[in-house]
Regions:
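Amphipathic alpha-helical dimer-interface segment in Rossmann-like NAD(P)H-dependent oxidoreductases
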Residues: 114, 123-142, 179-180, 184
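Conserved glycine-rich cofactor-binding loop
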Residues: 25-26
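Substrate-binding pocket helix/loop in short-chain dehydrogenase/reductase
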Residues: 108-109, 113-121, 202, 210-213, ...
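Catalytic Tyr-X3-Lys loop
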Residues: 103, 110-129, 148, 171
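Catalytic loop of short-chain dehydrogenase/reductase
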Residues: 148-170, 175-184, 196-197
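Conserved Rossmann-fold SDR core element
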Residues: 36, 66, 93-95, 172, ...
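Active-site loop of short-chain dehydrogenase/reductase
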Residues: 17, 65-66, 93-94, 139-153, ...
C-alpha cells in the first residue's frame, strides 16, 4: 500500500486473504475496507449504493490496494446467496466477513410501525445472519475463516432506538452461537461495538443527537480518541 493510507498494524498482515465488508460504501465500513486493504487483503465491498461502492473501490486502488464491489441488499436471501457465490467464483474463497451494514432512526417505541421495525431488524440482524450463513456454507465450512459482527453499545438498552437495540442484542447472541457451532470448522465469530463514531451515518439523525452524544460521553469517560470518535480517511 502506497502513500495515502498507512495502517498502524504490520504490513501484509492479511496478504492473500479475501475479506467481505458489508456497508462498505461509507462510514465505518469504508474505513474498515481501507484498513484491510492496507494490510494486504483483497476487499469485496458489499452495499446497496453503486456510486458509493465505486468511489471506495477507486480510493482503495489509488492507494495501491485491491478491491471489487457487489451491489446487494442483504435483507434479501437470494441476493445474498448470489453475492457470496459471485465472490467465491471470482476469488475462490472467503477468508473473513465484516458484517457492518446497518441502520436505524430515532423514534420512541410507541411510534414504531411494523414496517419500520422490520426494516431495521432485517438490516441489523437478519441480513447479518444471511451473510454469515452463506459465507460459512459456501466457503468457511471447508476452509475456516473469521466473522466480525459490528454491533452497538446496547447493554444499557437503546431508548429512542428500541428496534435497533433489539436487533443488536440478537446479533450478539447469534455471534456467540456461531462461535460455538462453527468452531469445529475453524471459524471464529466475534462482535465489536465501536461506540459513537462521527461518520456519515450521523447525517441521518437530528442535529441535536450529535450534541447529546458529546455531552453524554465526555472525553474523560471514553477511549483515547475522545468523546465522539472521528472516522479517519
Amino acid at each position: 500500500m502506497e502513500a495515502g493510507y498507512t495502517s498502524v498494524f504490520a504490513k501484509d498482515l492479511f496478504k492473500g486473504q479475501v475479506v467481505i465488508v458489508t456497508g462498505g460504501g461509507s462510514g465505518i465500513g469504508r474505513c474498515s475496507a481501507h484498513e484491510l486493504a492496507s494490510l494486504g487483503a483483497h476487499v469485496a465491498l458489499v452495499g446497496r449504493n453503486l456510486e458509493k461502492l465505486q468511489t471506495v473501490q477507486k480510493e482503495i486502488t489509488e492507494d495501491g490496494g485491491s478491491a471489487d464491489f457487489y451491489v446487494c441488499d442483504i435483507r434479501h436471501e437470494e441476493a445474498v446467496k448470489a453475492t457470496i457465490a459471485a465472490v467465491v467464483a471470482a476469488h475462490g474463497k472467503v477468508d473473513a466477513l465484516v458484517n457492518n451494514a446497518g441502520g436505524q432512526y430515532v423514534t420512541p417505541l410507541e411510534a414504531i410501525s411494523v414496517k419500520g421495525w422490520e426494516a431495521v431488524v432485517n438490516t441489523n440482524l437478519t441480513g447479518g445472519f444471511l451473510m454469515a450463513r452463506e459465507c460459512y456454507l459456501q466457503s468457511m465450512k471447508a476452509r475456516g475463516g473469521a466473522i466480525v459482527n459490528i454491533v452497538a453499545d446496547m447493554w444499557g438498552s437503546m431508548p429512542g432506538m428500541g428496534h435497533s437495540g433489539a436487533a443488536r442484542a440478537g446479533m450478539v447472541s447469534f455471534t456467540e452461537t456461531a462461535a460455538v457451532e462453527w468452531a469445529h470448522s475453524g471459524v471464529r465469530s466475534n462482535a465489536v461495538a465501536p461506540g459513537n463514531v462521527a461518520s456519515s451515518g450521523m447525517d441521518h439523525y437530528p442535529p441535536e443527537v450529535g450534541k447529546m452524544l458529546v455531552s453524554k460521553f465526555p472525553s474523560s469517560n471514553m477511549c483515547p480518541w475522545g468523546g465522539l470518535r472521528q472516522r479517519q480517511k
